[in-house]
Design a protein with these regions (language model features):
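Helical element adjacent to the flavin cofactor pocket in flavoenzyme catalytic cores
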Residues: 99-118
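A glycine-rich dinucleotide-binding beta-alpha-beta segment and adjacent secondary-structure elements
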Residues: 297-363, 370-372, 390-407, 412-418, ...
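Predominantly flavin-linked oxidoreductase catalytic cores and closely associated redox partners
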Residues: 112-286, 291, 295-306, 310-311
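Internal hydrophobic alpha-helix adjacent to the cofactor/substrate pocket in enzyme cavities
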Residues: 369-391
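C-terminal auxiliary extensions adjacent to catalytic cores
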Residues: 412-458
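Beta1/beta-strand and adjacent pyrophosphate-binding region of the FAD-binding site
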Residues: 2-14
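Dinucleotide-binding Rossmann-like beta1-alpha1 core, especially the glycine-rich loop
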Residues: 50-61, 85-101, 105
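N-terminal FAD cofactor-binding segment of flavoenzymes
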Residues: 20-82, 394-405
Length: 458
């Protein structure tokens, strides 16, 4: 045990990952979480590390951006990845979890850690007299949001996240729904709902015309203006700046008749056993729990009114009698103007004792948020030790994300892990095959990351 003491605000993925890592170094951590005294509009559970948008933590292959990120996290000692293994549900080549089991496992690890003291109460003030890590998430509001705004001297930015509905397995029509993964890769962990052309066109028309739920003042900031994309009938609605990775399905439908067919409803790699042919379009369902009694509708984040969700989504083949245990919702996502206010060590340039982690920084995604918590914790601990860590190599996934976060950008938007932010390979070492190229980039990243860890041993 050391004499160091640190405050962490927020027990989401980033806050829990940071608190557990710091506690593992002997630091005494005071972890503050506002639930259950106060819930954000999107959170329902009292547990820590609550997953909202999806139960998928994305791909595990090293030659994928998400898989590479996970490998770098493992090398930093991620406890959330260990918790994810406990809560794993089958999802082909992806790491998906039972949300409740995952949250319970993370909560257990935090509450049983002797170096972490949990305070179930909101915080309204940031004390700069000692290092503090703010990981309060994308729905930070109230006096704490005002405090952050005062520290950064910047109007907070915002965009919108949307959540997909969940249906019961027993309510599905298995004469139409079939189990398969694309191209037969891995186990048949997804259920598929195949459309023919006429069914799809009717569904698209109904979806494009469906009535959306009004956004609350906490979401819109009480601002009203025209939506950037008119719906199929040319009507306008409230403007929202939507993160592409959580795009509401109705906004996608408004972009064109085939947009969904080349997005979440793409039929490639699938054959409908009832016809022997590839469907015109296809909706996938992914298990929400280990028992596979619940499924979420993949890619169907939405802000439709609940009655409209039931009416329109029951037009999906196999979901005609679907029982919805959760409807989709839409909520605001608040984040810093990171390039202007954050250093490469994830602390405020003007207030170096104040560190930030998670989605509030502009890291977008579950695992990205957790990775950010690990990185911020390492930098904070180095500060306690009187050191400053050198920047992460830009050819690592974590390094590329931090570089994106802290590089000047007049139209800064959150970013998740993707191979496109890694620097290209030298021409003479650049395979033409994309999968081989990604593997070469991943192997380079792992080597660079391990070297950085060795050189900055904490």
């Amino acid at each position: 045990m050391s004499d160091y003491k640190v405050t962490v605000l927020g027990a989401g993925l980033a806050g829990c990952e940071a608190a557990l890592w710091l506690a593992g170094k002997g630091v005494q951590v005071d972890l503050y979480e506002q639930k259950p005294m106060h819930f954000s509009p999107a959170h329902k559970s009292e547990g820590f590390a609550e997953l909202i948008c999806s139960n998928s933590l994305k791909a595990e292959r090293l030659d994928s951006a998400s898989g590479l990120l996970k490998e770098e996290m493992r090398r930093m000692g991620s406890q959330l990845l260990q918790a994810a293994e406990v809560a794993r549900v089958a999802a082909g080549g992806a790491l998906a979890v039972d949300r409740d089991t995952f949250s319970a496992e993370v909560t257990r690890r935090v509450e049983e850690c002797p170096n972490i003291t949990v305070h179930r109460q909101p915080v309204e003030h940031i004390d700069e007299s000692a290092p503090i890590l703010v990981a309060t998430g994308p729905l930070t509001d109230g006096k704490l949001a005002d405090e952050i705004g005062a520290l950064t001297g910047d109007e907070r930015l915002h965009f919108y996240d949307a959540v997909a509905p969940i249906v019961t397995a027993e309510s599905l029509d298995y004469n139409k729904v079939f189990a398969a993964s694309r191209y037969g890769r891995g186990d048949a962990d997804y259920l598929n709902c195949p459309f023919n052309k006429a069914e799809y066109e009717a569904f698209h028309a109904a979806l494009a015309a469906a009535e959306r739920a009004p956004l609350h003042d906490f979401d819109t900031g009480a601002e009203q203006s025209a939506r950037p994309d008119p719906d199929a009938h040319g009507k306008k609605a409230d403007t929202v700046t939507v993160y592409e990775g959580c795009m509401p399905i109705e906004i996608m439908a408004a972009r064109g008749a085939d947009t969904m067919r080349f997005g979440p409803l793409r039929p490639v790699g699938l054959v409908d056993p009832n016809t022997g042919h590839r469907p015109w379009a296809n909706v996938q369902l992914r298990a929400e729990n280990k028992e596979r009694t619940l499924y979420n509708i993949v890619g169907f984040q939405t802000n439709l009114k609940w009655g409209e969700q039931k009416r329109v989504f029951r037009m999906i083949p196999g979901l005609e009698h679907a029982e919805f245990v959760r409807y989709g919702v839409m909520h605001r996502n608040t984040f810093l103007d990171a390039p202007r206010v954050l250093s490469a060590g994830l602390c405020l340039k003007e207030h170096p004792n104040v560190f930030f982690a998670g989605q509030i920084t502009g890291f977008e995604g579950y695992m990205e948020s957790a990775a950010c918590g690990l990185l911020a914790a390492r930098n904070l601990y180095a500060r306690l030790e009187g050191r400053e860590l050198p920047p992460l190599p830009a050819d690592t996934m974590c390094g590329a994300l931090v570089q994106y976060l802290t590089t000047e950008n007049k139209n800064f938007q959150p970013m998740g892990a993707n191979m496109g932010i890694l620097p290209p390979l030298p021409e003479d070492k650049r395979p033409r095959d994309k999968r081989l190229r990604y593997m070469a980039q991943a192997e380079r990243a792992v080597a660079s990351f391990q070297q950085w860890l060795d050189e900055t041993a904490l």
